[in-house]
Amino acid sequence: MEVLEMNACNIGKRLVELRGTKTQEEVAKAIGISTSALSMYERGSRVPRDNIKLRISSYYKEPISSIFFAQQKHET
């Protein structure tokens, strides 16, 4: 099984899904980033740097791999 980084659009969709009913302001403040940065990540116009990925993963209590990486099965 190969692990690949998801494209920015899929990462954005996953971040929106994780945020649920919380506001962007609430999540951004908790993570320590600007609301505009979180908005760009959620829209898929930017991918967070590794240190921000760690903060996001910690905040949502989700493994980095489940947020930012897709697993691709190879047929044999």
Question: Model-derived features: where do they sit?
Answer:
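Residue-level detection of the helix-turn-helix DNA-binding "recognition helix"
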Residues: G32, R43-S45, Q72
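A short, Lys/Arg-rich alpha-helix, primarily the initiator
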Residues: M1-T21
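Short amphipathic recognition helices of helix-turn-helix/homeodomain-type DNA-binding modules
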Residues: S66-T76
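DNA major-groove recognition helix of helix-turn-helix/homeodomain DNA-binding modules
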Residues: N51-S66
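Active-site phosphate/pyrophosphate- and oxyanion-stabilizing loops and adjacent acidic/basic residues
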Residues: V16, E25, L54
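Short coil turns linking two alpha-helices in DNA-binding domains
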Residues: S34-A37, R49, P63
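DNA-binding alpha-helical recognition surfaces that contact promoter or target DNA
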Residues: K13, E17, M40, S58, ...
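Short alpha-helical DNA-recognition segment
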Residues: T21-M40
